[in-house]
């Protein structure tokens, strides 16, 4: 038993928080294969029962970043990866928004995986749309540079995550690893729109982003529990702008968007979700388009491309209506 896991389990058994340095060391021990399955399970369960702190989340992310593959990216790159876990069954809103954001001129390094909740993850829907999940780091760099968007498949860039796959599966509960995807972008995207599935995660993830040196980001959760900027009502959000953390509320009707029901936003299989995304990019109007505009507009505000969400929505609408968003998809398909 390493010193770090012994000390960590001792503290967690007393429901005490782990110091950042100790957390970083114990994750390194985990990644180097020095922990037993029982120790890994105890660590993850102990953190979950106690409640993870922003410092613990950031330390996990720092250790995993060090173990993952990286790519070079333009300075203004953004990611729309969220935590998932809202179990709402909606279509792939943030993935669809990624094409719109890229069409508006902000490079998007979309980090994602196969489904973790619901029926369709970002990798599943992009595969249906004809985008290769096997792009090398070199080709992803080229896509970002010349097309303005790439998909970074978590399984390719973070193979170390496989070391805890069995323990996570056997525990059968959400753990700190369910929070880490948005913090592990291989392109080091300095701008983010990060959806979370619970209001309690808002301040935690915002603080973790700040610790990790995020340049500017919006963390959001819909009052309906959606891990997106929702269209069914208000969204609680936090803007992280360097050293500043500022809570605010997003109300769709203030931007001329009609409220809808969750049923209006339902997705289905990867094939069905792919068709929804394609129809939106081809110009179909309605609530599905509107929630994509709202999320893309918020992301453009987070990336400093727009002075506010209203201007961001206008830029997003222009990206769709001009065909630029659809063109991003077509170029990525052609490069597969």
From Swiss-Prot:
GO biological process: L-tryptophan biosynthetic process
GO MF term set: anthranilate phosphoribosyltransferase activity; magnesium ion binding
EC code(s) of this entry: 2.4.2.18
InterPro entries, alphabetized: Anthranilate_Pribosyl_Tfrase, Glycosyl_Trfase_fam3, Glycosyl_Trfase_fam3_N_dom, Glycosyl_Trfase_fam3_N_dom_sf, Nuc_phospho_transferase
Obligatory cofactor(s): Mg(2+)
Annotated positions binding 5-phospho-alpha-D-ribose 1-diphosphate: 82, 85-86, 90, 92-95, 110-118, 122
SUPFAM superfamilies for this protein: Nucleoside phosphorylase/phosphoribosyltransferase catalytic domain, Nucleoside phosphorylase/phosphoribosyltransferase N-terminal domain
Residues engaged in binding Mg(2+) 1: 94, 228
Xref: Pfam families: Glycos_trans_3N (PF02885), Glycos_transf_3 (PF00591)
Function: Catalyzes the transfer of the phosphoribosyl group of 5-phosphorylribose-1-pyrophosphate (PRPP) to anthranilate to yield N-(5'-phosphoribosyl)-anthranilate (PRA).
Family: Belongs to the anthranilate phosphoribosyltransferase family.
HAMAP family per UniProt: TrpD (MF_00211)
Subunit-level organization: Homodimer.
Protein name: Anthranilate phosphoribosyltransferase
Organism for this UniProt entry: Desulfitobacterium hafniense (strain Y51)
């Amino acid at each position: 038993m390493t010193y770090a896991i012994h000390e960590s389990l001792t503290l967690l058994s007393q429901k005490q928080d782990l110091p950042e340095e100790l957390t970083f060391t114990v994750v390194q021990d985990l990644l180097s294969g020095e922990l037993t399955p029982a120790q890994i399970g105890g660590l993850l369960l102990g953190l979950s029962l106690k409640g993870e702190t922003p410092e613990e989340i950031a330390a996990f992310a720092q250790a995993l970043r060090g173990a993952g593959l990286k790519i070079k990216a333009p300075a203004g790159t953004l990611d729309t990866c969220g935590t998932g876990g809202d179990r709402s069954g909606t279509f792939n809103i943030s993935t669809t928004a990624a094409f719109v954001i890229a069409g508006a001129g902000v490079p998007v390094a979309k980090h994602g995986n196969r489904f973790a909740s619901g029926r369709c993850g970002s990798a599943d829907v992009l595969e249906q749309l004809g985008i290769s999940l096997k792009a090398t780091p070199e080709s992803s760099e080229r896509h970002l540079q010349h097309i303005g968007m790439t998909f970074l498949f978590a399984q390719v860039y973070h193979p170390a995550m496989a070391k805890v796959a069995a323990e996570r599966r056997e525990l059968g509960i959400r753990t700190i690893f369910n929070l880490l995807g948005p913090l592990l972008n291989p392109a080091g995207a300095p701008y983010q729109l990060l959806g979370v599935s619970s209001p309690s995660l808002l301040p935690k993830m915002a603080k973790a982003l700040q610790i990790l040196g995020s340049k500017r980001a919006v963390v959001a959760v819909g009052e309906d529990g959606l891990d997106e900027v929702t269209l069914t009502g208000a969204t609680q959000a936090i803007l992280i702008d360097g050293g500043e953390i500022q809570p605010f509320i997003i109300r769709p009707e203030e931007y001329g968007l009609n409220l809808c029901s969750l049923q209006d936003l339902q997705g289905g299989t990867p094939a069905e979700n792919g068709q929804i995304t394609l129809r939106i990019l081809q110009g179909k109007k309605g609530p599905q388009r509107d929630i994509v505009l709202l999320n893309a507009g918020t992301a453009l505000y987070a990336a400093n491309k727009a002075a506010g969400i209203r201007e961001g929505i206008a830029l997003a609408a222009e990206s769709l209506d001009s065909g630029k968003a659809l063109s991003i998809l077509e170029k990525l398909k052609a490069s597969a």
